[in-house]
Amino acid sequence: MARITVEDCLEQIPNRFQLVLAATYRARMLSQGHAPKVDCKNKPAVTALREIAAGKIGLEMLKKVPL
């Protein structure tokens, strides 16, 4: 499987800071048992980035973060 890069994800979420926040929150969700939206047998952080690069996850992740 090809390596995932930040540039692949920046096409979906152009702001690097928002990208990191969305990927972090999604990785936490995956580690707590949520189902991945892409076929991936990697760690939660890599899976979250793959989901973002595939367009399955976007900025809506930031709206789900509890304050």
UniProtKB/Swiss-Prot annotation:
Pfam families: RNA_pol_Rpb6. It catalyses: RNA(n) + a ribonucleoside 5'-triphosphate = RNA(n+1) + diphosphate. GO terms for molecular function: DNA binding; DNA-directed RNA polymerase activity. It comes from the Bacteria. Keywords: DNA-directed RNA polymerase, Nucleotidyltransferase, Transcription, Transferase. One of its GO terms (cellular component) is DNA-directed RNA polymerase complex. GO terms for biological process: DNA-templated transcription. Disulfide bonds: none annotated. Its EC number is 2.7.7.6. InterPro entries: DNA-dir_RNA_pol_omega, Pol_omega/Rpo6/RPB6, RPB6/omega-like_sf. Promotes RNA polymerase assembly. Latches the N- and C-terminal regions of the beta' subunit thereby facilitating its interaction with the beta and alpha subunits. Belongs to the RNA polymerase subunit omega family. The RNAP catalytic core consists of 2 alpha, 1 beta, 1 beta' and 1 omega subunit. When a sigma factor is associated with the core the holoenzyme is formed, which can initiate transcription. This is DNA-directed RNA polymerase subunit omega. It comes from Albidiferax ferrireducens (strain ATCC BAA-621 / DSM 15236 / T118) (Rhodoferax ferrireducens).
